[in-house]
Structure formats: C-alpha cells, structure tokens
Amino acid sequence: MLSKKNFYINGKWVIPHQEKELHVINPSTEESCAIISLGSSEDINSAVSAAKKAFESWAFTSKEERLKLLESLYSLYKKRWNEMAEAISLEMGAPIDFSTQLQAGTGASHIKSYLKVLKDYKFEKILGDHAPNNKILYEPKGV
C-alpha cells in the first residue's frame, strides 16, 4: 500500500500541519490502496505563499527557458509512464492496460499542448503598420 503523507512545498517535502489522513479506495477491489494526508488551511497558505514567491523569479524566465523546462518535464513523464499508469489504475480501479495505453497519456498530452501553445504564443503584438513602435506586450500577472 502506498503511503504519501508529505507535501511538496517551496522546493522540499514537508510534514503537514495536521495529522489528518484519507484512505484511497480502489473501486475495483473496494480496498484501501493508499494513505494520503489531507491538507489544512495552514498547508494551503504555505503553498500559496511559496507559489507567489516563486512567481517573482518565474515571471522573468524567457520563453526558451520555459520551453526547456517543459521539455524536461515531458521527458521525465515519459520515463515514468508505467508508474503513472500503475497509480491511475490503483486509484481509479481501471485495468492496467487501459491506464497504460490511454489514461497515462492524458498527462503527457497536456504537457505537449502547453509546449505547442508556448511555442506559438505571441508575447508581443504590433498595433499596425502605421505605428510599428506601438505594441502590446503580454506579461505574466501573478499566481
């Protein structure tokens, strides 16, 4: 049985503020297949605070840096494809072949979509030929 009781906040695994757990039930066996921690408002506040802090530097990353990070994430996802399929199969009670062939692909498809959007996205729009120096810049706003 899987036991995942810590949260990844601010670049490290941390112990939740409260010891409240949930047994994840596999619908196909009706048995507990994992134990996870339930977050408190303190955990949520810590995560949001960390995200806001991370945004300060993330907002200044270039398109190329973001593409490189997303490509690394996609590569890692593909390497751990079978682990994803096993986790999905346990949680949803789906046959492993179905999880491996279809459901695990959903996460990979999302990452590929983000890559395509980022590659094609125009962060700068010239308002017209008559005023080539007049531009609209699209910049990150926040978390």
Report each predicted region and the residues it spans.
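Short, intrinsically disordered, charge-balanced linker/junction segments flanking boundaries
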Residues: 136-143
